[in-house]
């Protein structure tokens, strides 16, 4: 059935501690995606409802400066390239505080997207409400939703950020393959590996 966004969006919670350690993360596997509407580097606003007809939507909390993100960026581009024809849409969201980390400003996001030839929307979560509502803690951090907007996988892209030739388990690709084939992923959650989101 088509995705119908909830009538309310959870408001931001001040983030000074690890919310997951307190059991306060908003989204759990099986939960419905929370709606958002964010500006992209392409000059358009993007809402989750825009992609309601997709087989799967991959939301990745990302940024410009984190070395973990930079190590995985090319793989993010390749995943979108390989799965676009199968009805998959990747969305990257930058929620970092640009006042403290100017490299994550919206103009710098535009430069990075152009430099790396991003083939997916790169969105700015200036208020940090989306990251807070999703319970995101790291960059990159993956939230994979099926065509009913249920969370089916959360965690890392694969098991080796440092060397893509040494990857043994492609968690995100495996989860996508499962959803596309009509089954649930064997692995539904892994521990996110990356930089902390830079909260205001």
What positions do the PLM features span?
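Chalcogenol-based redox active-site neighborhoods
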Residues: 2-189, 196-200
């Amino acid at each position: 059935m088509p995705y119908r966004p909830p009538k309310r969006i959870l408001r931001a919670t001040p983030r000074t501690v690890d919310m997951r350690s307190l059991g306060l993360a908003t989204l759990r596997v099986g939960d419905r995606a929370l709606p958002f509407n964010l500006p992209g580097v392409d000059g358009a606003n993007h809402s989750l409802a825009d992609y309601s007809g997709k087989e799967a939507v991959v939301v990745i909390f990302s940024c410009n400066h984190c070395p973990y993100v930079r190590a995985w960026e090319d793989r993010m581009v390749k995943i979108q390239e390989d799965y676009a024809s199968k009805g998959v849409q990747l969305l990257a969201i930058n929620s970092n505080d640009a006042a403290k980390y100017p490299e994550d400003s919206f103009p710098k996001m535009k430069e990075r997207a152009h430099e790396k030839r991003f083939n997916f929307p790169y969105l700015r979560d200036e208020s940090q409400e989306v990251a807070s509502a999703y319970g995101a803690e790291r960059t990159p951090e993956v939230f994979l939703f099926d065509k009913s907007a249920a969370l089916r996988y959360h965690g890392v892209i694969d098991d080796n950020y440092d060397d893509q030739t040494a990857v043994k388990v492609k968690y995100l690709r495996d989860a996508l393959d499962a959803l596309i084939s009509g089954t649930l992923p064997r692995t539904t959650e892994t521990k996110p590996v990356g930089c902390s989101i830079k909260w205001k």
